[in-house]
Amino acid sequence: ENIILVLTIDIALNRSCRQLEWRHLIVMKKVITYGTFDLLHWGHIHLLRRAKEMGDYLVVAISSDEFNKLKNKKSYHSFENRKMILEAIRYVDEVIPEHTWEQKVQDVQDHQIDVFVMGDDWEGKFDFLKEHCEVVYLPRTEGISTTQIKNDLLAVSK
């Protein structure tokens, strides 16, 4: 279900008491994507821009520090810092935490999501969401990844 904003405009015609009521419906298409978004780079920005182009409102769910520990992942930036960075990006309308793998169906329902977007390295992993929304896997940006950045930084420091 979409968010519907109803604007009402009253127009007085020829100084009479007659009024016309116009209703204009605006339906927002909502998109969601998930990730850690640590060491933000142009591949992330490219994903966020393409996701935003698929709708009017982009929700980004980022892995909480606790969830990263469960996945045996270590982030350089804390959840709060990653959230602050993402909120400053013009393509992003809302940032929410990702605490578990299982929360995606609930997020899609709670935020009335129309399109679920992930990189194609996750191809097929979220097809179960197709009964709730459209699922799109976008090609990854070639030549960049957070893992590559971390490895390059380690190599430079040696």
Language model segments and positions:
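Nucleotidyltransferase catalytic core that binds NTPs
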Residues: 4, 8, 12-16, 21-158
